[in-house]
Amino acid sequence: EYAREVKPEAFIQFSTDETSGPCEDGQRFEEWSPILPSNPYAASKASQEAISISYWRTYDLPIIITNTVNNFGEMQQPSKFPVIVQKKIAKNEVVPIHGSEGNIGTRYYIHSRNVADAILFILKNTTPYHHIPNKVDRPDRYNITSDDCLSNLELAQKIAQFMGKELKYELVDHHSTRPGHDKAYSLSGEKLEKLGWKQPVSFDESLKNVVQWQMDNPQWIE
């Protein structure tokens, strides 16, 4: 409603890879793949997408929807997996990894600065679609993703490597600890790549910088 008053040139609706639900091996969802959320969080994000589309159709708000894979970065919430891993490694504690032997969940990761770069690229290089009355159409939409797919164990191993410490871990049943937690999500970034966007900083360099920042600022993960 506030956007209707101020009339922005573009309204970015941030969403998640979770709205499409779990993927099969090798599958990558495109921008308008079916919405099949598995848990209440993903359903709430899908609802936000639906509301933004309704405002685009009803009021011609300049909506652009973005769906993003797992973000990480300096000053990330302490409750997020990469921070939990580093905190436990620093304290020489066991890191719980969701999954079983040979069946550990995976995620695509992207640094938050790369996401910001993608958003600025979209704003500079695209123009929001306008709704045409009585036409079955939809707003513009982009997946912001990477090619950096790691299992939770692989991510923990990289963090331990960059810390120069040993990783102690145990596999735990994710269905009992996190109901509705999907094994894998995956988005295709082909649409944005065709426009010319590329990640400015690699995953390994980004993660190494984040780990070092948290080692230099231990109060953040205590």
Which residue stretches match the model-derived regions?
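Flexible, glycine-rich beta-alpha linker
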Residues: 19-21, 36-40, 64-83
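Short glycine-/acidic-enriched loop or helix-start segments at secondary-structure transitions
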Residues: 22-24, 75, 153-155
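Active-site loop of short-chain dehydrogenase/reductase
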Residues: 3-11, 61-62, 94, 136-139
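Structural signature of the Rossmann-like NAD(P)-dependent dehydrogenase/reductase core
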Residues: 10-15, 64-70, 108, 143-144
